[in-house]
Each structure stands twice: as structure tokens, then as C-alpha cells.
Amino acid sequence: MNTIAPDHYKTESGLQVWDVTRYMSGNMAQAFQYVYRAGRKGNEAEDLRKAVAFLEDWVAHPDVPRAVLPEGIEPTDGPSVGGCLLLDIPDGSQWKVQPLMQIISADSYEGEAMNGQPFCGRRLITNETLPRLKKRIAELGGVDG
């Protein structure tokens, strides 16, 4: 283990969480990291509560910019790496894949939703991601749910 890049943020293939989060806005990067490491280090419910706090703060502040990509980086770079990172999630943690992809999408995707309406990342987080994480916390014996 390297203290700068601990094992709970790495995959078997060597990808690291920061390979995705470097392209994300602050709150969303923190939420992604806490969901990713949940159950890999310390108390899973506590990590999920921290992720929920970052997501709720992101939803509450629409004036804060979403992911800002440096020149030369395509919007698909982070999600593409994110997809590769999620392929390495162990079977027992597959529940994380959907909320992690929703966090990436909410922070970086602009355009239309599948129904043809404008995509709204904050609605996705509020209506799908937060309830899913709170349900998981409740299943772990936490208070949320």
C-alpha cells in the first residue's frame, strides 16, 4: 500500500479513483470517492453518509459549476475511465456501479435525456442516487432510508 494512493482507491488492474475524479467538480469527486471505497475501508454506512452529504450539498447549490474540463480533454474521457474503473468492482459490490455512473453523468453530461427532455443531473441525484444510497445505509443498519 502507498499512503498517497491507498489500496481502497485502486482496482486490480491498477486504475485509481483519481483517474476519474480529476475531471469532476469538488463535491461530486468526494461523493464518488466515498461510494467507491464504501466497504473497502472502515465503516461502509459512514462512508455512504459522507457521500450523501456531498451529494445533497451539490444539489442544494446549482450556482456551483459542474465538472470543468481542461483544454484538450473530451467530456467522454472521465466517464470512459469511470466505466473501466467500474468493470473491476468485485461481485459483492456491484450495487455501487449504478450510483457511481449516475454521479459521473450528473456532473459531466449535457444534452437530452433518453425521453428527449433536457438532462438534469440534480434531478437524477435527487430522485435516484440519493434514495438508493439511503436505502443501502438502512440495509447496513444505519438510520437513513
What is the predicted function of each stretch?
Residues 1-145:
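Intrinsically disordered, low-complexity regulatory regions
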